[in-house]
Amino acid sequence: MRRRILAPSALLAVAALLTVAAPGTAAQAATRSPTYYVSLGDSYSVGFQPNAGSTPGYTVYVARHTGLTLVNFGCGGATTSSILTLVGCPDVLPHTVSGVTYPTTTQIAAAQAFLTAHRGHIGLITVTIGGNDVTACATQASPIPCVGTAVNSIKTNVTTLAADLRAAAGPKVPIIGSTYPDVILGSYVWPHNPPAASTVNLANLSVTAFKLLINPALSKAYVSAGGSLVDVTAATGAYTSLTRTVNTKTYGTIPVPVASVCALTWFCALGNIHARTPGYTLIGKLIVARYYSVTRR
C-alpha cells in the first residue's frame, strides 16, 4: 500500500484549525472564577505595625503559598462584638493588601455577602479576633477575673461568628482561627528592665490566661463550626518554662519565651502589641501548614 503524503497546503490547514481551537480553551480558562481566600479580624489580620500602618502581614504570605486570591475584610481595633455589630470600620488602615471597605454594613455581614456570592469558589477563611477583648485586663488590679469575664463574651461571639461563616461558605471550606503571641511576657523588659515584682507576676498570669482561658475558648468556638485554631501563643514559646534564660544583646539575660516575644513583636521595644514581620510570617506558616493538613486528608 502506498503511503499518502499530505500536501503543504493541507498541513497549513490543519495547523490553522489547531490555532483557532486553542484560543477558545484559553478564553474559557481566562474567565474561570478564581478561588478566594477570605480574611476577617482585627489589626493582626491587616498586618499592622507601628509607624508603618498596614503591611503584608500574614495574609499575603498565606495567599502566596496557597495560590488563593486574597480578599481582606479585617479592621483595626475590632473586637468579637464589633465584628458582628459595628457598621463600617472606624479604623480603616490605608494600603491594606486586597482590603475591602463596607461603610454601610458590619464586617461579618460584608464577608457573608461575599461568601454567598462566590459560594463554590472559596478556598479558605481565616479569622484573628479576640485580642482587643482582653487587652484592657493587663491594667486591672485582678487580671484573671477580668479575662474570665471577657472570655465568656469571646466564646459566645466567636461561636456565632464561626457559625455564620460556615453557613455562608458551605460545609467543606476550611475555617482557621489564629491566636496571638503573648506580648505581656515582654513586660519583663518594657518599660523597665529589670522589671518590678508585680510586672513579673503579670507576665506569669498572662501565660495562664492564654493557655487555660482565652485559647481554649477560641478553639472550642471554631471547632463548633467545623473549623480549627492555630495556637500562635504556643508556637512562639509562651508555654515553656520561664526559668530557662538566654543572653541577648539588647536586654541582657532574660527568659527564653520573653526573648521570643521580643524578636517577634514590638512590645519589648515600643510597648506595642503588634507583630514584627517575622512574627506575621510565623503566623502565616502556621496557617498554611494547617490549611494543607486539612485539605489533603
PLM features: what roles do these ranges have?
Residues 153-155, 185-234:
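Substrate-gating cap/lid alpha-helix
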Residues 92-150, 182:
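Oxyanion-hole/transition-state-stabilizing segment in secreted/luminal serine hydrolases
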Residues 254-297:
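Histidine-centered active-site loop/cap adjacent to the catalytic His
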Residues 85-103, 191-195, 242-269:
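Surface-exposed intrinsically disordered loops and tails
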Residues 1-29:
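Secretory targeting and sorting signals
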Residues 36-41, 45-47, 69-74, 123-128, ...:
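Structural recognition of the beta-strand scaffold that forms the well-ordered cores
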Residues 29-86, 125:
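Serine-esterase "nucleophile elbow" of acetyl-processing enzymes
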Residues 24-35, 60-64, 104-125, 159-171, ...:
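Short amphipathic alpha-helices and their capping/turn segments at secondary-structure boundaries
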